[in-house]
A protein has these predicted regions:
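Solvent-exposed soluble domains appended to multi-pass membrane proteins
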Residues: 1-225
Length: 225
């Protein structure tokens, strides 16, 4: 789960407390394009966003009854995997979760991903609380890029991380974990504030992942989007 919390006027962020310094630095880069993305659901339905982004189709237009686009797909479909694959790219999907969830193991094959890598395929998983860390996934993306380079091929990789998955309870990262406070203009309950602090910590780690990957690819000769 990720969003730019600095877009919301109810928060009192400062330069020191900004949870997204890497994102904001990247937005100011003269070569960067930035904006807002509208996703097909709120607080759930991750696979629907994946489907929309990869196919250009809209989950909301597929079925009035289906809760997930992935449960509607049952055959080969055009997607970015096929577009890039046709141009000789190595294409891959990474997700540190269960392959059966949202039927991803079949759907990504139907979407044309050359390689699918799930938690069961990964070694020495690193966790922060219950979920695999974003930093661990950044390392796998770097390794996948190196593999593509060694093959003499460009790479299209789509990774769905999981660290900031719900729930956002105070014990998410273990008893005694101290979350940086989140200052707001609104009067909110202690429970709501606690959830915000937990969620923001995950957003902060996602931004750190972005910073790591930006620094890594900035040192590469190959052009990277």
């Amino acid at each position: 789960a990720f969003s730019d919390l600095t877009d919301q006027p109810m928060f009192n962020w400062t330069e020191e407390t900004d949870p997204l310094p890497n994102l904001h630095a990247l937005q100011k880069d003269p070569h960067a394009l930035s904006g807002h993305i509208v996703v097909p659901g709120f607080a759930g339905g991750t696979a629907n966003t994946e489907f929309d982004a990869l196919t250009g189709m809209q989950t909301n237009a597929l079925s009035v009854t289906a809760t997930s686009a992935m449960r509607v797909v049952n055959r080969n479909l055009d997607s970015l995997f096929r577009v890039f694959g046709a141009d000789g790219y190595r294409t891959s999907f990474y997700h540190p979760g269960d392959a059966w969830f949202y039927n991803r193991e079949n759907v990504y094959r139907w979407l044309g991903a050359e390689h699918e890598v799930f938690a069961k395929d990964m070694k020495d998983l690193e966790y922060k609380g219950r979920w695999v860390t974003d930093d661990y996934m950044a390392g796998l993306i770097e390794e996948e890029f190196e593999t593509a380079v060694s093959e003499g091929r460009p790479l299209f990789n789509y990774t769905t991380t999981i660290q900031n998955h719900m729930s956002y309870t105070a014990d998410k990262y273990g008893e005694g974990y101290v979350f940086p406070p989140v200052s707001t203009t609104a009067d909110i309950s202690p429970d709501t504030r606690s959830m915000l602090e937990v969620y923001t910590e995950g957003v902060r780690d996602a931004d750190a992942m972005l910073g790591r990957l930006t620094a890594y690819f900035a040192e590469r000769e190959e052009p990277v989007v």
